[in-house]
Amino acid sequence: TVLDICPVTIGDNVFFGPNCMLATPVHPFRYQERNIKYKEDGTAYDDEYAKPITIGSNCWLASNVVVIGGVTIGEGCVIGAGSVVTRDIPANSLAAGNPCRVIREITEKDSIKYKKELF
């Protein structure tokens, strides 16, 4: 699901697992600012705003990942299942958790050719 009140930029060859959410809106914490208000002409408005999301090429976001507005995920990243991404993730990183944190860099040693159990 993409809630795109602000631009969402997705690079080439990005894989999304089921139930991923990209949410650009940011809501105020105080209910006085979050509740709907009305202008003199009767038009409704609120103080919601949004921040863009950028996902670099060749990323994989596993199942149930949530990406919050204002975040950039660098190229070649893997984001673990159930992660909530609240801050930028540098390129070629394995990251997971709630909140999502970088676990380590993805390197040549992660190549499938080194997984002897598969051959």
Predicted regions and their residues:
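Flexible, glycine/small-residue-enriched loop-and-beta-strand segment within the central core
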Residues: 1-71, 98, 106-107, 112
